[in-house]
């Protein structure tokens, strides 16, 4: 993880999850590294991602877009259905991509205007925290208490796809700072 090639390989292996890697990652040292990452299971994905990104942030600026392009190519089919794949890709893009543009102007002044978006994001977080329905429901209810109108329920996992998360997060970014605070807390 301290060498750029190893860090790239770990990043790609994490994003692929249990999908068979492409030929370039099935040979030599890369294949061994992919196998090691797969054997570690899911609990170490985020710590491994942190270590890999720390190394990749030191990569030459002209190499970073290449890494991101390869990552997007590897994850293109899965990113829209697999929440973890989407999250890993988004984290890598944030750390390795070009500096972010300014935040959108806060023009949403009521939580009710973004209730659907809150429901999508917090449902995804609840399912990511625990796949057992009872635990996910309990977590969702605790997190959204006072944020959502009565009657808003935990969405099924298939309704919390990255296709719905991206626009929901973009709309929540437009909330005024005072309304963002309870969402973050």
Report each predicted region and the residues it spans.
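Small-residue-enriched hydrophobic alpha-helices in membranes
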Residues: 1-76, 83-185
């Amino acid at each position: 993880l301290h060498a750029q090639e190893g860090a790239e390989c770990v990043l790609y292996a994490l994003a692929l999850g249990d999908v068979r890697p492409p030929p370039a990652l099935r040979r030599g040292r890369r294949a061994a590294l992919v196998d090691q990452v797969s054997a570690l299971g899911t609990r170490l994905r985020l710590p491994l991602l942190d270590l890999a990104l720390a190394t990749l942030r030191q990569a030459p600026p002209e190499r970073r877009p290449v890494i991101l392009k390869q990552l997007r190519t590897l994850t293109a089919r899965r990113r829209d259905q697999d929440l973890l794949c989407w999250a890993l890709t988004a984290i890598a893009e944030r750390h390795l991509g070009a500096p972010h543009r300014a935040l959108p102007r806060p023009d949403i002044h009521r939580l009710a205007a973004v209730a659907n978006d809150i429901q999508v994001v917090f449902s995804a977080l609840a399912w990511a925290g625990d796949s057992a329905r009872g635990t996910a429901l309990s977590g969702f209810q605790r997190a959204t208490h006072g944020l959502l109108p009565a009657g808003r329920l935990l969405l099924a996992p298939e309704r919390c796809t990255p296709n719905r998360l991206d626009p929901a997060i973009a709309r929540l970014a437009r909330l005024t700072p005072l309304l963002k605070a309870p969402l973050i807390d």
